[in-house]
Amino acid sequence: LQLTRASENYFVEVKKNTNLENFVWTQRPIVIFANSEKDPNFISQIEFLSEDLQALEERDIVVLVDTNPSNSSLLRKRLRPHGFAFILIGKDGQVKLRKPSPWNIREIARVIDKMPIRQQEMDRQKQEKK
C-alpha cells in the first residue's frame, strides 16, 4: 500500500489482532477489504479517500485496510467480507454501511453527517465558534 506522508495518519493496515473496540467513541473506522492490493475496487477506494483527507479528519475517520485474506484477522472473522468490501463503522462500534463497491468521499460524508452522534458533534462545533 503506497501512501503519502500526509495520508499515513488516516490509513492503517489491519493486523491479526486489530480490534474495533479500540476505536469506540473516539473514531469512525472505515474498513476496506480486498483480496489483493491490485484489486481495481480497492485502488479506486483508496484514491477516493485520499482526495479529501480533511473530510476524514473532520469526521474522525480512520481507514483500516486488509488486503490479505489468508491473514484471518479478527476483523475478517467478525465482518466476513467476500472479495472487496467497504464497511463504515459508527463511533458506537456498530456497522452503519456495507457496500460491495467503492464510495466517494462526498457520499461517505453525507451518510456520516446524518448520524445522530455526528449531528451532536457539528452542533458542538457551531457553539464553540460563537
Describe each model-derived feature in a short phrase.
Residues 1-130:
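Non-catalytic interaction/Regulatory regions outside core domains
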